[in-house]
Amino acid sequence: MGSNGADNAHNNAFGGGKNPGIGNTSGAGSNGSASSNRGNSNGWSWSNKPHKNDGFHSDGSYHITFHGDNNSKPKPGGNSGNRGNNGDGASAKVGEITITPDNSKPGRYISSNPEYSLLAKLIDAESIKGTEVYTFHTRKGQYVKVTVPDSNIDKMRVDYVNWKGPKYNNKLVKRFVSQFLLFRKEEKEKNEKEALLKASELVSGMGDKLGEYLGVKYKNVAKEVANDIKNFHGRNIRSYNEAMASLNKVLANPKMKVNKSDKDAIVNAWKQVNAKDMANKIGNLGKAFKVADLAIKVEKIREKSIEGYNTGNWGPLLLEVESWIIGGVVAGVAISLFGAVLSFLPISGLAVTALGVIGIMTISYLSSFIDANRVSNINNIISSVIR
């Protein structure tokens, strides 16, 4: 390493080793060779056009392309950049950053490149009340924290933690994070669609099973609710007050007065739910359901469902689902997770009247967040479902 290159390799969060273009314009090479003066080390820059390998691959990874600029004109002298003695930016070069979700830890990504060391091997990403927060782990005890309010790259803030040495221009960080934001957006959309499809299948299957006891009207409405869930992509849930108002109309139906034996049986069914086991079942349905604290979310649904049946107060249950979205879970994933938990409730051995209550309440919870008209349809069939 040159004398200034060694310091840059240590102090530059997005440089080091053979990093081709995410670091300081000077790097770990020796002085004296020609280098392109393009604002990126050694002629590397982000691709302005989509590359054939850009985007998602079948293995779940995401590829971002950077390349050497053929039009860059080498200047004599100066720092040769992170690639040592190669200062000629005129030759065409293409590289890729590969980002792979870590399935063992929601929100963590493994970043790698087959040819060059990258800015960080691990990236943690989370959404907190509309703000994207990224932590780039560079070396033990050192990391770079990037905060992007409202996913607006122009509001980006970069903090260097336990960092010694000079800070560099954040332009290159911004360019990478803007690409990573695009990746995260596409990933969320894929996960939401996957979750909604899986949840709709579960609710439809539950409707078929309960329909054997509750009749064809219930089965048909349950399928309509399942279809509503499948097509919920990109939408927001109704507010707590709106959802509660719709649910109260169902609860006010005289047929929804639950007798003690049915209530005890339903509460006992919820008490049998093992949150960890159910979380494992749901998590195995696909990447979409691998959300943080899944077992805790299942346990909250279990506790607040029991509270609802025991006290008649269903507000805490609906507020729980709303809190997931406030905490950063995409609305479609929240609805899907809620539907999956409700669909996995063990119902064997329950009386038909208890099954009727569970069946009506399940589709009513879900529809109260999605469509007031669907809740009205549910209310209209209660007399034929619960006898």
Swiss-Prot record:
It comes from Escherichia coli. It is a multi-pass membrane protein. Residues 1-11 have a biased composition (Polar residues). One of its GO terms (molecular function) is transmembrane transporter binding. The chain crosses the membrane at residues 325-345, 350-370. It is found in: Cell membrane. GO terms for biological process: defense response to Gram-negative bacterium; killing of cells of another organism; negative regulation of ion transmembrane transporter activity. Residues 14-30, 78-87 have a biased composition (Gly residues). This is Colicin-N. One of its GO terms (cellular component) is plasma membrane. This colicin is a channel-forming colicin. This class of transmembrane toxins depolarize the cytoplasmic membrane, leading to dissipation of cellular energy. Signal peptide: none annotated.
